[in-house]
Curated annotation (Swiss-Prot):
Protein name in the entry: Probable rhamnogalacturonase A
Keyword terms: Carbohydrate metabolism, Cell wall biogenesis/degradation, Disulfide bond, Glycoprotein, Glycosidase, Hydrolase, Polysaccharide degradation, Secreted, Signal
Annotated source species: Aspergillus niger (strain ATCC MYA-4892 / CBS 513.88 / FGSC A1513)
EC annotation from Swiss-Prot or TrEMBL: 3.2.1.171
Active site: 216, 291
Highest taxon in the source lineage: Eukaryota
Known role: Pectinolytic enzymes consist of four classes of enzymes: pectine lyase, polygalacturonase, pectin methylesterase and rhamnogalacturonase. Hydrolyzes alpha-D-galacturonopyranosyl-(1,2)-alpha-L-rhamnopyranosyl linkages in the backbone of the hairy regions of pectins.
InterPro entries: Glyco_hydro_28, Pectin_lyas_fold, Pectin_lyase_fold/virulence, RHGA/B-epi-like_pectate_lyase
PANTHER family assigned to the protein according to its UniProt record, in alphabetical order: PECTIN LYASE SUPERFAMILY PROTEIN-RELATED, PTHR31736
Signal peptide (UniProt feature, chain positions): 1-18
Glycan attachment points: 50, 115, 124, 236, 281, 318
Subcellular location: Secreted
Record lineage: Eukaryota, Fungi, Dikarya, Ascomycota, Pezizomycotina
Length: 446
């Protein structure tokens, strides 16, 4: 087998500024893993004929390399009829340079990586993909098919330079993971709820330079979570980024979202709950640009789309919304500021500053606050936290609301009844910024 054009990575995990608590990423490079052992799935029975099931070959390659090594999926088209549970890896990497097409019909997760450390999944060519063909389910009204990718209890990891398309259910879930980095990804799903882009909970995780198209979660933090940094995110006809849904014993702290661009989505950012308990604190949401979204800043502690949970409500405190620009679809119907907090667990120390948005339809917009205390717009600045409701109507556009768009903004969604094409990974995910890390394809050809 010819030598693999493996992306050169630093031996030490990366440390960045922000809400992270320490270094993130694999502890050893793909080069060192390959030098220990290389397991090509073709040697374990895989055939790039878009017919032969790759599931057993990938499982066997993992078993052979899980104690240290690199698993290689060469360019080509592979069918996946049986799902894989890849467990107990130590210093293991997977290079996906081919395209995996779902042919199986089981539920669960097509690819589950669990109880592993020092793990990396990426594509040398930045074109490796998994095509879930979710439309086969969705056109029948079925949203209970498999997820594409799930990491569970994985530490010191990276997932990058891969494309996930048309998941029957969620696209990518990180469940109780730590010290990880996710970047340079494109996720493209159907235009329906229940088809989440990225859901993450855990500790010390950096998600950046990701494009998501769907109609549910773009990049969403769930509980429990701490020290999560999310930046340079392109929600391109999506549900939008969010926190939640939040229920009993919520425990979220030290979260930073910045440089988030949202186009034709449900919201720019939503914190959603209905009853429940616990806390969300020390969160910053800054440098947001939006256009054509139904909601913009949306905190809803009585979110009717979830069943009410026992408890007085999730306590939100020390949350800052800063430097938001752009336009919303209809500011009279759904104003750009909505901070609706629980009467029995009011929000405290909320800050809204440098916020300038204007309606695309009509000539007025509203700001609504309920039981929310802090500084800015309709928030009440008071030592008292008794319940209140106020709505302000604005008929003059604020200065500085104008914001640029992205050239790749979609003009329509991909529906739910036809196959969705595999996109390429962009090199910019926020106006005026290039990706923090170059695509792997650029590094391997340099």
């Amino acid at each position: 087998m010819p030598a693999l054009p493996i992306l050169a990575l630093a031996l030490a995990p990366l440390l960045v500024n922000g809400q992270l608590s320490g270094s993130v990423g694999p502890l050893t490079s793909a080069h060192s893993k390959a030098a220990t052992k290389t397991c090509n799935v073709l040697d374990y029975g895989a055939v790039a004929d878009n017919s032969t099931d790759i599931g057993s070959a990938l499982s066997e390659a993992w078993d052979a390399c899980s104690d240290g090594g690199l698993i290689y999926i060469p360019p080509g088209d592979y069918a996946m009829d049986t799902w894989v549970s890849l467990s107990g890896g130590k210093a293991t990497a997977i290079i996906l340079d081919g395209t995996i097409y779902r042919t199986g019909t089981d539920g669960g997760n097509m690819i589950l990586v669990e109880n592993s450390s020092d793990f990396e999944l990426y594509s040398n060519s930045s074109s490796g993909a998994v095509q879930g063909f979710g439309y086969v389910y969705h056109r029948e009204g079925d949203l209970d098919g498999p997820r594409i990718l799930r990491l569970q209890d994985v530490s010191n990891f990276a997932v990058h330079d891969i494309i996930l398309v048309d998941a029957p259910a969620f696209h990518f879930v990180m469940d109780d993971c730590s010290d990880g980095e996710v970047y340079n990804m494109a996720i493209r799903g159907g235009n329906s709820g229940g088809l989440d882009g990225i859901d993450v909970w855990g500790s010390n995780i950096w998600v950046h330079d990701v494009e998501v198209t769907n109609k549910d979660e773009c990049v969403t933090v769930k509980s429990p979570a701490n020290n999560i940094l999310v930046e340079s995110i392109y929600c391109n006809w999506s549900g939008g980024c969010a926190m939640g849904s939040l229920g009993a014993d919520t425990d979220i702290t030290d979260i930073l979202y910045r440089n988030v661009y949202t186009w034709s989505s449900n919201q720019m950012y939503m914190i959603k709950s209905n009853g429940g308990s616990g806390t969300v604190n020390n969160t910053v949401l800054e440098n947001f640009i939006g256009h054509g979204n139904a909601y913009s800043l949306d905190v809803d502690s009585y979110w009717s789309s979830m069943t009410a949970v026992d408890g007085d409500g999730v306590q939100l405190s020390n949350i800052t919304f800063k430097n938001w620009k752009g336009t919303e679809a209809d500011g009279a119907e759904r104003g750009p500021i909505k901070v609706v907090c629980s009467d029995t667990a009011p929000c405290t120390d909320i800050t809204i500053e440098d916020f300038a948005m204007w309606t695309e339809s009509g000539d007025e917009q509203t700001y609504t606050c309920e039981s929310a205390y802090g500084d800015g717009f309709c928030l009440e600045d008071s030592d008292s936290t008794t319940s209140y409701t106020t709505t302000q109507t604005v008929t003059t556009a604020p200065s500085g609301y104008s914001a640029t768009t992205m050239a790749a903004d979609l003009t329509t969604d991909f529906g739910t009844t036809a196959s969705i094409p595999i996109p390429t990974i962009p090199t910019s995910f926020y106006p005026g910024l290039t990706a923090i890390s170059p695509l792997a394809s650029a590094a391997t050809t340099a």
